[in-house]
């Protein structure tokens, strides 16, 4: 049975294996744990003591938030875990005016079903040496 947690305090780096599939340089489990704990808001999906998914938000806590990461382990995809993670995270961010994210075009229907709208523009910098 999948359970959910809104804190990474009880998570260890050893529980964070198999994420960041396809990334040219993946964060180490220790770095992954650091980003979970440093996020303004987090939701974590667990199958027993195995972390199978997570979503994070960074925010000013007043008006805006950005969702940089949503990941579900490949073996657990297509079970609505990602949907539940985002739904729970949006509940944590309910008082904010804007919640933004960037995603690949093929993921737009997933996020649209959760209430997100396509925005016209977005830009970014990727510094792989900092992963």
Where do the protein language model's features map onto the residues?
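Short amphipathic alpha-helix that is part of the acyltransferase structural core
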Residues: 1-30, 122
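Small/polar loops that bind or transfer phosphate-bearing groups
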Residues: 8, 68, 102-103
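Conserved beta-hairpin
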Residues: 35-55
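A conserved beta-turn-beta hairpin within the catalytic core of GNAT-like acetyltransferases
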Residues: 58-67, 77
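Conserved acetyl-CoA-binding loop-helix of GNAT-fold acetyltransferases
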Residues: 72, 78-91
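Conserved active-site alpha-helix within GNAT-family acetyltransferase domains
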Residues: 95-131
């Amino acid at each position: 049975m999948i359970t959910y947690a809104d804190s990474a305090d009880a998570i260890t780096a050893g529980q964070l294996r198999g994420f960041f599939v396809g990334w040219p340089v993946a964060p180490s489990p220790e770095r992954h744990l650091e980003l979970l704990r440093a996020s303004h808001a987090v939701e974590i999906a667990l199958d027993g003591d195995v972390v199978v998914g997570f979503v994070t938000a960074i925010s000013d806590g007043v008006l805006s938030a950005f969702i940089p990461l949503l990941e579900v382990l490949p073996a657990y995809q297509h079970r609505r875990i990602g949907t539940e993670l985002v739904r729970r995270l949006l509940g944590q961010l309910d008082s904010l005016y804007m919640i933004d994210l960037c995603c690949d075009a093929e993921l737009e229907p997933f996020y649209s079903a959760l209430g997100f709208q396509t925005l016209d523009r977005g830009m970014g910098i990727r510094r792989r040496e900092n992963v």
